[in-house]
Amino acid sequence: MAADVSVTHRPPLSPEAEAEAETPETVDRRTPEQELPPLDPEEIRKRLEHTERQFRNRRKILIRGLPGDVTNQEVHDLLSDYELKYCFVDKYKGTAFVTLLNGEQAEAAINTFHQSRLRERELSVQLQPTDALLCVANLPPSLTQAQFEELVRPFGSLERCFLVYSERTGHSKGYGFAEYMKKDSAARAKSDLLGKPLGPRTLYVHWTDAGQLTPALLHSRCLCVDHLPPGFNDVDALRQALSAVYTPTFCQLASGQDGQLKGFAVLEYETAEMAEAAQQRADGLALGGSHLRVSFCAPGPPGRSMLAALIAAQATALNRGKGLLPEPNILQLLNNLGPSASLQLLLNPLLHGGASGKQGLLGAPPAMPLLSGPALSTALLQLALQSQNQSQSQSQKKPGILGDSPLGTLQAGAQPSNSLLGELSAGGGLAPELPPRRGKPQPLLPPLLGPSGGDREPMGLGPPASQLTPPPAPMGLRGSSLRGLPKDSGPLPTPPGVSLLGEPPKDYRIPLNPYLNLHSLLPSSNLAGKETRGWGGSGRGRRPAEPPLPSPAVPGGGNASNNGSKAFPMKPRLLSPIASNRLPPEPGLPDSYSFDYPTDVGPRRLFSHPRESNLGAHGPSRHKMSPPPSSFSEPRSGGGSGGPLSHFYSGSPTSYFTSGLQAGLKQSHLNKAVGSSPMGSSEGLLGLGPGPNGHSHLLKTPLGGQKRSFSHLLPSPEPSPEGSYVGQHSQGLGGHYADSYLKRKRIF
């Protein structure tokens, strides 16, 4: 159904009548988008000459029919009268691609060598076909040549660039051509310029066939009419409005496949002159309350093809910068990211917005709530709960590497713990099947930072922070010593200010070295001496001491029976240099855990070696390794006599050439004379000196030049020719060892 619109147009008038008809009413009826001032004839001539020169500036020629053995030099000699910028010869196809100085030389070369002969072969010379020519349409009429070059130059090297001007007025017709040296540059320019807004217009870019583009075809016969009234669909009214001078041969409104109008129309005239006259009369014409904007389309295609091209170009321009799928909303994005990533994404700008510490000109901002919007607060809360539920369910379903997760044993009604490590228990590690204590859950991590329970007092660690119900020992660990023992589950008061490592010894001598100072290793609150408290507390008395389990004595003279009752004993000398006897374990405490192994199996068995017969009379103990002599540590008030040196420790560089026992004895006498310890300053760092029955030297790696010696792995070096004398110019043991190594290295 045709819309009820009013069309206002003027019949063709002579120049004299046209001047007389310029009335305010006529000016109001025709309001073009942009009025351009008239140009003088000289400026019109210059613009037209520039367009013609650029249009003919095709300087690339193609030579066909060359002999198969032609060389590049022969082509240069053939075109010696011209200035060659580029020449490529394809011997297999017998062609040459040549770029000359300008289009005039290219035309002259074509006229001279076309259908000429070279070695009795006829040549064919013509312009190279190009596929990098673009037509940029819907430009503002006031755009100059320099501005157009600036618009298209950033995408690549230009071969030609020019605007098309009207032969009557000299003004731009609103489109121009740009030819690039490479096709990929032209494709990039088309992709970036299509749909780009330039002033009040939107650019349209089309590929152009340079072979079909002639000087006569530079001027378009098609017009594009936009700024139509909303919902305008009367084709006859539009045809009548633009038939004031000439009647168009084609007039159609643009519509999509669904029949929806696109808001513009395309008209085609018989000649370019008719189209130009219709454009000048119809531009700014009032139609249905709107002023039409009439512009030139790209030249070449007919009106029907141009209409389809403009519809496709408009769709591309509207979807500029968008993907094929619709943009997802914020909820879909957060759902795809997951709860943890969503929380981090939402909270980062809120938490770190003022992390820089910079304040505005008016000072610090007032205190504002973290989440001002209730919807955002609710969303974050739901995400947090969902993330927590997922993490808990995953941790309960998936067993850990060492067995079931400790989270799986937590009851549903248990309250969350306030501490990450929980409360220290009275014993060692927790069994996986430990039931939670009433009111408080079990700690998530066992107290692996140090011993607890009965081991704390002799080590100088102080009493434990609190006590939980001791867990039942696994069947593989508990033995007959646990049967029949009563359970103890009474809580103890938590002493204030006690760290995980407990209290340091009161008579500990702080080293003078600032890097080994105790202040840099332990908290300052633990440096002050405190009263040593046992397991007893208010309302609870100390249990009577029970005799320790009997075990064979150590050859070194120390009593290691209590230490041998545990799988991995913590020595009393580990954190204190004071010699003291270990308190017997109390019943029901994890201190009474033990292995049910024979008396001939102990920690020394872990380090056993077939090289035991070399020690002679100093036979190794069947239960524990012999500690080093007392000369390896500081004098102690209550220590036992030192035993023979273990064959696993060699304390000096001489152990490279002698057995461990002999080298250790030599080094011990040397240390007595010098007054230093072979273990270095680290021996007294935390009281790690080995006691009479301690094996702290097993917990260390030998320092720099101190290595374990095994005479059966490396051959014994030859004795030094200089004996034990080391003079000023003597090579000593090091030089002799190097010579011996060079002699014997081939056996490896």
UniProtKB/Swiss-Prot annotation:
It is found in: Nucleus; Cytoplasm. PROSITE patterns: RRM. Keywords: Acetylation, Cytoplasm, Nucleus, Phosphoprotein, Repeat, RNA-binding. A motif (Nuclear localization signal) lies at residues 45-60, 743-746. It holds the Pfam family RRM_1. One of its GO terms (cellular component) is nucleus. The gene is Raver1. Residues 59-130, 132-210, 221-299 form the RRM domain. SUPFAM superfamilies: RNA-binding domain, RBD. The modification Phosphoserine is found at residues 6, 14, 480, 576, 626, 630, 716, 720. This is Ribonucleoprotein PTB-binding 1. It comes from the Eukaryota. Residues 1-42, 390-505, 525-647, 672-731 are annotated as: Disordered. Residues 675-685 have a biased composition (Low complexity). The keyword Repeat applies. Cooperates with PTBP1 to modulate regulated alternative splicing events. Promotes exon skipping. Cooperates with PTBP1 to modulate switching between mutually exclusive exons during maturation of the TPM1 pre-mRNA. The modification N-acetylalanine is found at residue 2. Its main location: nucleus. Ubiquitous. Detected in aorta, brain, gut, heart, kidney, liver, spleen, uterus and skeletal muscle. Interacts with PTBP1, RAVER2, VCL and ACTN1. Part of a complex containing RAVER1, VCL and ACTN1. The modification Phosphothreonine is found at residues 31, 469. Residues 307-401 are annotated as: Interaction with PTBP1. GO terms for molecular function: RNA binding.
